[in-house]
Amino acid sequence: MYLLLFAGVAAYALILMKQRPPLALYEARTKQADYLPLSAVPARQTELLVELEDSDFYTHSGVNLFEIRSAVQRNLGAKKIVYGGSTITMQLAKNLYFRFTHNYLRKAAEILIALALERKLGKERILDFYINIIYFGNGVYGFSDAVRFYFGKPVSALTLNQMFLLACIPPIPTRGNPIQYPEVFERIRNRRLNYIRRKKEPLISQAEAAEIFAHDSSCLDPELRKPDDFTRNYPQTIPFINERFGRFACSDGAPLHHYFGTKTSNRSV
């Protein structure tokens, strides 16, 4: 029975990749106007994203078995799927091929696709692809758009505090968003900063950490976008759009039109 189940999941994963070849998806993304090559992202920003999301990214083959086992044990204890144990490669697979359904069969297919992505794309292109489609809350996908949305400045002008702030958003982009929920985000930021400081070779020095800690929830960063009608109203439409069309509805450049009420700000992203 389990063998047949595995064969079915494997066949499903193969069909998805045949319909939407990973390399073709990657090349299509590089041709879009908001594409940001990995080489244009500050090296420290990349290091922070990798360290906080998947510290073993450069050594695993797409799947971290220890994290998967830990997630399964915690989910069994919670009696529902709460923890994913996902690597960066698995998150890329989820963003490219799956809707927001949470079940073990989808996770199994996600694992198989992640293993295939490692072979077909390699680490550099996976990371390049990842930073261009990762969700940063408020309907913002991709690092380039996130920098413009949250700080209104070019990537090259980011401060260390802003880099760290952006690196902390992806794990909880909605419920821990720094604009709508600054107090929640502050707790997330502090936990992650302490995690990095405990490393044998921390990416952030004690002096730099003290500077980041100086920003509390009342001012996470002086340049951070303030709450407005757009950030208050627009996120309410995201669950509807994702449920109706899926996360990858526009991944090939197809237009998706959505109309807002007159009270919604017309400030552009």
Q: What spans do the regions from the language model cover?
A:
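Juxtamembrane regions of bacterial inner-membrane/periplasmic proteins
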Residues: 1-269
